[in-house]
Amino acid sequence: MTALAASGLRARMESLDLLANNVANASTGGYKADREFYGLYASAEASANDYPGTMPVIERPWTDHAQGMLQSTGNPLDVALDGKGFFAINGPNGPLYTRNGNFRLASDGRLTTPDGYAVRSTQGSPLVLDGTRNIQISSDGTVTQEGTIIGQLELADFTSTDGLVKQGATYFRIADPKLRPTMATGATIAQGQLEGSNTGSAEAAVRLVSVLRQFEMLQKAVTIGGEMNKRAVEEVAKV
């Protein structure tokens, strides 16, 4: 019983890490919540002896890619995706993908993320704009300035998001070498809007409190189990 409670305690500790990160990013644009999935683990020794006991563990944390609410900002450099897909970014070590369209202009005119990574055009190159001229971004990502087409935002989609892993709070990179990006055809772009986090602060806080209570109960169970084991050993020693 003590081992079972200890295993549950470890699983809840992992959950607390995930949930604390969700709470911290509840107001981060384009953030996708981390979720926990509890599985049951049986050791090789237990399986070999047909021992029925199993241990709860977080089998595999997963990312919830559900779309967040779109929020109007009025900033022409802010863009939100409505539908499936990602903005393609030139990261420091290769392509990255994000739902956070909080873009800005670098001193050289490149359209970048807040971290300074260039936003990719459909040609794979950065988009370079004139900060003194009006910027229009259409629903298909075409960028124009005073009637002149500058380029088009590259929108990527994937047959499965299982092969994507988080890099930082709002970026994703391809971890599965077999996974290839395709053109996102089911999404439209809304200029002057941003997609909010898909985890609300209230929801994340409630879940955090719930898991914290479970953690405290399991912690007590481990302590009580340890004391019972100690007393049992002492009683055996008296025999």
Indicate residue ranges for each PLM-predicted region:
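Amphipathic alpha-helical polymerization modules
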Residues: 1-239
